[in-house]
């Protein structure tokens, strides 16, 4: 059976054929609003399922941007890999088809997408702690430090994901820093964007970060970890959509999440700033303490007991993460796939002000990331000069 894009009826027939539902009455709907996939919610009695099928192109561009369907298999493999070490934070996978590029997984509709929930004023008191634990566990347990270099290389071969890595390389590390067709620059930001495009130091540092992304295979990454890829409630957190998964630098997922916590402050900056900074604080401290505990208990690194080594590893992760966060702040402000955190600010004057802030904060994090050896340095990180220029 070859690939074809599913209709709602196709989705129902697949889950029924697989024995995941019986012959009882079924309701189903297409709910996907992403750029790369079809997503169907299927309910039969008390059983609720999600069927996600990859498309062979990016919907935002069309068939002129073809994509390999292999990413669907990579995504389900990553979900299963992450579930081995962080099961409370990963949806259960019931079935996957490589040929038809679909995965059937648990329905999470009892939770809300974090980005939308935050915009509606929802509170997620455990989110930062949960994601800190999730990333510490998924990154540590898929790294050389936990499984050794031979086993890691064998695992990494399963996550060769060139199409989606190419998207990241272009949309995060290249296009926002040049006059690219994919950019979406709001009128009134031209002077700020010119400042970025003409900043030689900034471009040099972005090039270094891109080189890290391309060449440094520390651990299995989610690859696209933002608040739109997380379902949560006050008590529960689930991370979805790891179709960008590949072996890359520890700091990338960490930086992506930090960037989107910054974005989550912008809809009501004066009120939310301190709350989001506290979230970043909780996230990093949970990540660092969990990673360090796993290292001390389970690392197979020959020099694992060398004085200060794990602290040096965490310092490097933090610095890289801040640089990657800066790139994401700039990309999501003027590049492809803008964030609702900024776009839904109705007052155009305020919206432009917040976008300028995001661009300057991003540039400052990129250029000055090496000032932060520890999280105490980040707490004291002063970008007043950049933000006031």
From Swiss-Prot:
Coiled coil: none annotated. Transmembrane segments: none annotated. InterPro entries: Aminoglycoside_PTrfase, Kinase-like_dom_sf, Methylthioribose_kinase. Pathway: Amino-acid biosynthesis; L-methionine biosynthesis via salvage pathway; S-methyl-5-thio-alpha-D-ribose 1-phosphate from S-methyl-5'-thioadenosine (hydrolase route): step 2/2. GO terms for biological process: L-methionine salvage from methylthioadenosine. Substrate binds at residues 224, 331. Its EC number is 2.7.1.100. It catalyses: 5-(methylsulfanyl)-D-ribose + ATP = 5-(methylsulfanyl)-alpha-D-ribose 1-phosphate + ADP + H(+). ATP binds at residues 37, 52, 106-108, 241-243. Homodimer. NCBIfam families: MTRK. HAMAP family: Salvage_MtnK. This is Methylthioribose kinase.
